[in-house]
Amino acid sequence: GIVDFAKGVLGKIKNVLGI
C-alpha cells in the first residue's frame, strides 16, 4: 500500500544518509 511504499522510500533515504 501507500504506507508501505512511503516506509520503503524513507528506509532507502536513511540508508543513503547513513542514519
UniProtKB/Swiss-Prot annotation:
Keywords carried by this UniProt record: Amphibian defense peptide, Antibiotic, Antimicrobial, Secreted
GO cellular component, one term: extracellular region
Transmembrane segments: none
Name of the molecule in the record: Uperin-2.5
Primary location group: secreted
Top-rank taxon, per record: Eukaryota
One GO-annotated biological process of the protein: defense response to bacterium
Taxonomic lineage: Eukaryota, Metazoa, Chordata, Craniata, Vertebrata
Tissue expression as described in the entry: Expressed by the skin dorsal glands.
Cell compartment(s), UniProt: Secreted
Function per UniProt: Shows a medium antibacterial activity against M.luteus, L.mesenteriodes and S.uberis.
